[in-house]
């Protein structure tokens, strides 16, 4: 594999120089702001992909899931939020992006709807100098269309479709209006709503719509420009409602758990092997008609609802010799969820629901000063971010009378010396059948940083040097309640028995550099060399509960973990001619002090610095105009991602492949422009190949998501100010696991999580704008 990559790199670099002499007369430049200043995608010294508004339309992209698996170097277990770039992932069960960051314009955030966006910028490689923590593998930026004072604009679209394996319809509605107030001021408002039907079936509750996702969002933006002054204010709000189990591998997208095996016979025995559990047997005894490929058995249908709002102010001023920008963002968020814990605590015999609630705020401030274009260009800035969670109950887990007697029975009433009485706890933990609860007194993280970057230009060369000097601090204080704790009397020493107290604080500081050297002999060729470093914030773990003490996966537990470091080196070339463009990059990353998130089968989780890894590979973006109206494009990556040290608690040995990483992936697209009754029309056909991946280091077949090839078709026609488009996703209805994870410890409670790639969907979309 490594020799193949090296050979492809050499061939690609050699070929990229051959057609340089064919100059382009007319080049439609794509301008990006990835380096906090306007540059063309051709000249910027990094591997960047740009998805334009027109490309989103032609490819039928409505949500991030539609493009994430088509990008070179991007791996995701599915869904719209969680992804990794360049293989930088070690979590055996990925529930946070961790090594990547996402921005909407100048502030952190993600867009669930790809509507009224000017473009999407995908920045590969560590971006810690300008974008701070978590931009280890890269950054994705959603660039919105801004208010336009010159004219009134309006647009709307609606989509209606069907999805294989679901009786419900795909629905989406988007609307935008732009209103000029005067020559210098305008307001722009957008609204989006979507519903993606579920395909999973819960035998216990006899529901066949598990996995349904509903998302609503709006934003309203005011822009005022007066000479050197520009002021933009925006308020946005997003709401989500996900109905279904969010499996360990991907807390973003509902999936299924413990797919029914028809070969399992009904029995009261606890354990039949790795593929037959008690839930299989219970399901086999049900009269509910179900599809075994999509069915599972869970006492309770899980649900999660989220709400996020953000107020943003951006003030720019042109001082003549330099530009200054102040960016402020205030976030408020709340998440509520109900999850089924009958698998963990009551052995699928009794109802056991864990109610979760989290709310808080996040404030960010960035002040940046940049020079004007010239032989020496510089940017310096200050950044501050503060996150605070609201005090209050976060988790409450009551069972019923039967479940309570069952748990106290198998614990032999050894807990609390046989005198466990949850009614002595404060509300809402005073439920007589409470098994577990948690309370947050405070939790915060804070990051402060000074950063700078300077470009030196001479002849056809540009040297860039950057540095970020950061300080991190964080802390929390909380209590836990329940039958699993005894003897503790809380933080003040006067609480009822079984009330723990956890308090931890910490801080650290460090620097992260960046250097690039680019050679630009003309507007059609750029060769660049990059050395950059990324990092993730350190933090604290809550105390390990006693019921996890003997779990082998908890062997590496410690109360504090620090920032990790990813040192990236890459060499790339961007070349274009009359009918082609090529972007090729070879990278290698040395990742140390890795924050490994461990989620033992006991139901807990913690993070520690326990890993070292290396990733390397080739990323290719290529387009070629076959004729004046037939266009070919290719985007793909071929990489190696391996751990370089043993991690006993995860069963990882040096040389093992990093989890949830597809080492090969590519997307080939063919677009054909034509006319229908004198109206412009297009047809686009995509072949998307995604390589296999494993949820754990062990590379066990039970944790393997196989490779697949999916076909998509989009056909559209423009009718004056409107578009009509037919989209078919997964044309052949390919059935493959997008994510699969088996938790087999402890052996009597195995859990098998599964998420299919989206089945075939057929939809019609209508867009109108003026």
Go through the PLM ranges and name each one:
Residues 98-99, 114-119, 124, 129-218, ...:
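Outer-membrane beta-barrel translocator/receptor signature
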Residues 207, 213-379, 386-387, 582-583:
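Outer-membrane beta-barrel domain signature, strongest for Gram-negative TonB-dependent receptors
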Residues 402, 677, 688-696, 717-770:
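C-terminal beta-signal and adjacent terminal beta-strands/loops
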């Amino acid at each position: 594999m490594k020799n193949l990559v090296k050979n492809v790199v050499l061939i690609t670099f050699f070929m990229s120089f051959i057609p340089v002499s064919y100059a382009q007369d007319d080049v439609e430049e794509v301008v990006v702001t990835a380096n906090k200043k306007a540059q063309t995608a051709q000249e910027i010294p990094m591997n960047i992909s740009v998805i334009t508004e027109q490309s989103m339309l032609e490819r039928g992209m409505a949500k991030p899931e539609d493009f994430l698996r088509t990008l070179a170097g991007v791996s995701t277990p599915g869904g719209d939020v969680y992804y990794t770039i360049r293989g930088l992932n070690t979590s055996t069960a990925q529930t946070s992006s961790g090594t990547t960051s996402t921005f909407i314009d100048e502030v952190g955030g993600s867009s669930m709807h790809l509507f009224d966006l000017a473009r999407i910028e995908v920045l590969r490689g560590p971006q810690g100098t300008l974008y701070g923590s978590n931009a280890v593998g890269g950054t994705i930026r959603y660039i919105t269309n801004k208010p336009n004072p010159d004219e009134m604009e309006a647009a709307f679209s609606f989509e209606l479709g069907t999805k294989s394996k679901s009786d419900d319809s795909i629905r989406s509605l988007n609307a935008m209006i732009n209103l000029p107030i005067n020559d210098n001021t305008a307001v722009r408002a957008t609204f989006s709503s979507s519903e993606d039907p579920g395909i999973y079936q819960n035998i216990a509750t006899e529901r066949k719509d598990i996995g349904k996702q509903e998302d609503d969002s709006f934003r309203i933006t005011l822009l005022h420009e007066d000479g050197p002054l520009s002021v933009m204010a925006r308020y946005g709000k997003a709401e989500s409602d996900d109905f279904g189990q969010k499996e360990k591998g991907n807390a973003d997208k509902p999936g299924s758990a413990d797919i029914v095996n028809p070969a399992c016979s009904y029995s009261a025995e606890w354990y039949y092997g790795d593929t037959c559990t008690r839930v299989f047997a219970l399901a086999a005894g049900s009269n509910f008609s179900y599809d075994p490929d999509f069915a599972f058995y869970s006492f309770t249908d899980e649900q999660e609802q989220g709400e996020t709002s953000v107020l943003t102010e951006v003030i720019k001023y042109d001082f003549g010799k330099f530009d200054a920008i102040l960016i402020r963002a205030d976030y408020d968020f709340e998440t509520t969820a109900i999850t089924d814990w009958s698998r963990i605590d009551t052995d699928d015999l009794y109802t056991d629901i864990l109610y979760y609630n989290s709310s808080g705020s996040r404030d960010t401030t960035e002040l940046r000063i940049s020079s004007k274009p010239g032989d020496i260009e510089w940017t310096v800035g200050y950044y501050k971010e503060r996150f605070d969670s609201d005090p209050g109950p976060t988790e409450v887990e009551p069972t019923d009378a039967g479940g309570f007697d069952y748990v106290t029975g198998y614990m032999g009433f050894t807990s609390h010396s046989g005198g466990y009485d949850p009614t002595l706890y404060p509300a809402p933990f005073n439920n007589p059948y409470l098994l577990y609860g948690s309370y947050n007194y405070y939790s915060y993280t804070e990051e402060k940083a000074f950063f700078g970057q300077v470009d030196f230009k001479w002849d056809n060369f540009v040297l860039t040097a950057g540095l970020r000097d950061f300080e991190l601090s964080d802390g929390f204080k909380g209590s836990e309640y329940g039958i699993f704790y005894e003897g503790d009397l809380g933080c003040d020493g006067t609480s009822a028995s079984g009330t723990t107290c956890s308090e931890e604080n910490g801080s650290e500081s460090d620097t992260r550099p960046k250097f690039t050297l680019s050679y630009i002999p003309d507007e059609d060729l750029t060769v660049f060399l990059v050395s950059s470093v990324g990092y993730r914030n350190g933090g604290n773990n809550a105390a390990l509960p006693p019921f996890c003490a003997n779990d082998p996966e908890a062997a590496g537990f410690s109360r504090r973990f620090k920032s990790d470091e990813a040192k990236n080196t890459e060499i790339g070339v961007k070349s274009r001619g009359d009918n082609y463009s090529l972007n090729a990059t070879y990278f290698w990353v040395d990742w140390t002090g890795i924050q490994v998130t461990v989620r033992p089968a006991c139901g807990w989780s913690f993070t520690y610095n326990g890993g070292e890894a290396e990733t390397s590979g080739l990323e290719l973006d290529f387009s070629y105009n076959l004729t004046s109206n037939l266009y070919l494009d290719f985007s793909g990556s071929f990489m190696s991602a391996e751990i370089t040290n043993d991690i006993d608690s995860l069963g990882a040995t040096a040389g093992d492949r990093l989890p949830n990483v597809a080492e090969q992936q590519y997307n080939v697209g063919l677009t054909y422009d034509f006319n229908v009754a004198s109206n412009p029309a297009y047809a686009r056909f995509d072949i998307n190949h995604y390589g296999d991946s494993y949820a754990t280091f062990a590379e066990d077949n039970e944790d393997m998501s196989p490779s697949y090839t999916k076909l998509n078709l989009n056909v559209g026609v423009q009718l004056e100010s409107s578009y009509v488009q037919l989209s078919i996703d997964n044309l052949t209805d390919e059935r493959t696991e997008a994510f699969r994870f088996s938790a087999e410890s402890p052996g009597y409670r195995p859990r098998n999580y599964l998420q299919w790639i989206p089945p075939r969907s057929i939809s019609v979309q209508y867009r109108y704008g003026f």
